[in-house]
Curated annotation (Swiss-Prot):
SUPFAM superfamilies for the chain: Ribosomal proteins S24e, L23 and L15e
A Pfam family this chain is assigned to: Ribosomal_S24e
The entry's keywords: Ribonucleoprotein, Ribosomal protein
GO cellular component, one term: ribosome
Organism of this sequence: Methanosphaera stadtmanae (strain ATCC 43021 / DSM 3091 / JCM 11832 / MCB-3)
GO molecular function, one term: structural constituent of ribosome
Descriptive protein name: Small ribosomal subunit protein eS24
Ribonucleoprotein as UniProt keyword: yes
Position of the signal peptide: none
Homology family: Belongs to the eukaryotic ribosomal protein eS24 family.
InterPro entries hit by this protein: Nucleotide-bd_a/b_plait_sf, Ribosomal_eS24, Ribosomal_uL23/eL15/eS24_sf
Biased composition (Acidic residues): 92-105
Gene: rps24e
GO biological process, one term: translation
Annotated spans, Disordered: 85-105
Length: 105
């Protein structure tokens, strides 16, 4: 998966940077939002808690998707501005502790 940043715009009113990107994935299926988020965090040298992938739209018949990501200045700004659904789809899944199965003999 390769991500190209198309446009990067500062939005001082909302304390964030908006990034329009193109994601190419020629040998695999459409990546998940979390995969794209991790790649953008690495590219932008940002914190995982401050970046959200708002939308990602795959192109029909082409292994390419276009999307919008936002990097906030603080977690307070992110919580105040973003909708709960966007925050939920950008959260890491919780790891469930593995319980050992006991044999009932």
């Amino acid at each position: 998966m390769e991500i190209k940043i198309i446009e990067k715009k500062e939005n001082p009113l909302l304390n964030r940077t908006e990034i329009k990107f193109e994601c190419e994935y020629p040998t695999e299926g459409t990546p998940t939002i979390l995969d794209v988020k991790h790649k953008l965090v690495a590219l932008e040298d940002s914190s995982n808690d401050l970046l959200v992938v708002d939308s990602m739209k795959p192109s029909y018949g082409v292994p390419t998707a276009f999307g919008l990501a936002k990097i906030y200045d603080s977690t307070e700004s992110l919580a105040k501005i973003e909708t709960k659904s966007v925050i939920a789809k950008n959260e890491e899944p919780e790891e469930e502790p593995e319980e050992e199965a006991e044999d009932a003999e």
